[in-house]
From Swiss-Prot:
A zinc finger (C4-type) spans 57-72. Belongs to the RecR family. SMART domains: TOPRIM. The keyword DNA repair applies. It comes from Vibrio cholerae serotype O1 (strain ATCC 39315 / El Tor Inaba N16961). Pfam families: RecR_C, RecR_HhH, RecR_ZnF, Toprim_4. Residues 81-176 form the Toprim domain. This is Recombination protein RecR.
Length: 200
């Protein structure tokens, strides 16, 4: 089926979203044009506004409309001296939803990946190094993903912490709550055994 240039352009633009291929993009475009033009206009306006007005927090690098985000500007979040290092702003949302962490964050916006040309300065480790030098951080909690790149990134940051005599800890990895051992992969099970803790 031959489509108009504008429609092709819309479908191509929609494909920038993760998990959206040609068919999904076509379905979305047709839905907006056929059934929800008002929603399409609202989406276009919201996207345009967000791309212009949402930037990065000067302290933790998460997304915010201000120079400093609401977490970093909260004096109570500084009291325990804890800094949780994550790979993306989505990780902050997940951790905040638990209600278990009351410190501050630092967002890497990725992980070390030499094969892809992503080095320490590309993920803000020079900025993190400067923050460690300031002396107001007593513990860095490494919450990078349990991938090869995430582990390598955590090890690199742990070395930075050692240089500044700041405690570094790694979030636990293991068997999910409600999970069955026979269904858990070997690597996860190994992490569970190595990260076990005493009950008495």
């Amino acid at each position: 089926m031959r489509t108009s240039h504008m429609l092709e352009h819309l479908m191509e633009a929609l494909r920038c979203l993760p998990g959206v291929g040609p068919k999904s993009a076509q379905r979305m475009a047709f839905h907006l044009l056929q059934r929800d033009r008002k929603g399409g206009l609202q989406l276009a306006e919201a996207l345009s506004q967000a791309m212009v007005e949402i930037g990065h927090c000067q302290e933790c690098r998460t997304f915010t409309e201000q120079d400093v985000c609401h977490i970093c500007s909260n004096p109570k979040r500084k009291e325990n001296g804890q800094l949780c290092v994550v790979e993306s702003p989505a990780d902050i949302a997940a951790l905040e939803a638990t209600g278990q962490f009351s410190g501050r964050y630092f967002v890497l916006m990725g992980h070390l990946s030499p094969l892809d040309g992503i080095g320490p300065s590309d993920i803000g480790l020079d900025t993190l190094d400067y923050r460690l030098q300031r002396g107001d951080i007593s513990e860095v909690i490494l919450a990078t993903n349990p991938t090869v790149e995430g582990e390598a990134t955590a090890q690199y940051i742990a070395e930075l912490c050692r240089e500044h005599q700041v405690t570094a800890s790694r979030i636990a990895h293991g068997v999910p709550v409600g999970g069955e051992l026979e269904l858990v992969d070997g690597t996860t099970l190994s992490h569970s055994l190595l990260g076990r803790h005493k009950l008495f």
